[in-house]
Amino acid sequence: MKAQTILETIGNTPHIRIQKLFPGSEVWIKSERSNPGGSIKDRIALAMIEAAEASGELKPGGTIIEPTSGNTGIGLAMVAAVKGYKLILVMPESMSLERRRLMLAYGAAFDLTPREKGMKGAIERALELVEQTDGAWMPQQFENPANVDVHVRTTSQEILNDFRDTPIDVIITGVGTGGHITGVAETLKKEWPNLKVFAVEPQASPVIAGGQPGPHPIQGIGAGFIPANLHTQALDGVIEVDAAVAKDMARRVAREEGMLVGISSGATLAAILQKLPDLPDGARVLGFNYDTGERYLSVPDFLPES
């Protein structure tokens, strides 16, 4: 393919069958690490910026300020670099060093907030910066409708294109902003009425399941609150995952399937492993690989000791 800019290569990511981790089961993973910025968040970064340009909220020479746990920030940094915007990213200090360095490589500036305040603290700080900065615009990924819409227009259609004649029975996927699980669930359930969709969240912060927020090391999911973009009525259940098991599954899929994935993708694989015994024989399951494991090599216990 030929592209006029790197942004034209966002989307159309492959679906890869897992061969060894789940013997006797048909499990597919949508490889969002194949996006040019390396994660599923490239989709929403471009969509939110283009929507703001169209509405006039973001003007040439403007500044983008966003609270992010990392991957949205990297996607925004890539898009901002192409389009010529200044970008300030706000995130908890617990986010991995690799993510921060990637943002810097794209030319973004960032502001770190206390880890114990989680994403709530990052959002509060970002709102302060918007008030202090002329020409600032905040995408607000947790509530921006362009977030859900891009998954309706692109992600869902890609799944339909590949599985129209062999429908997916169960989708199991994590919740960060809520955009992709909402967009995919609401769109695909219209095509496949029997489709079941399960959200994955950290056992240590089971907010969607009705529990209390808490600190956890599964970066990218489990924000500690229910985002406006998460339409819980589209879900058929929640699967809670232990962080140690998520890291173990991330290591296993690298060594057994050759897929180097992040911790949140490991959490999805752990949730699939947990749910498979409850599913009917022959169920076709789809999960997501949100980003690459290269972003977590410095995270404690992500790599085996030897």
PLM features: residue spans?
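PLP-dependent amino-acid enzyme catalytic core
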Residues: M1-S306
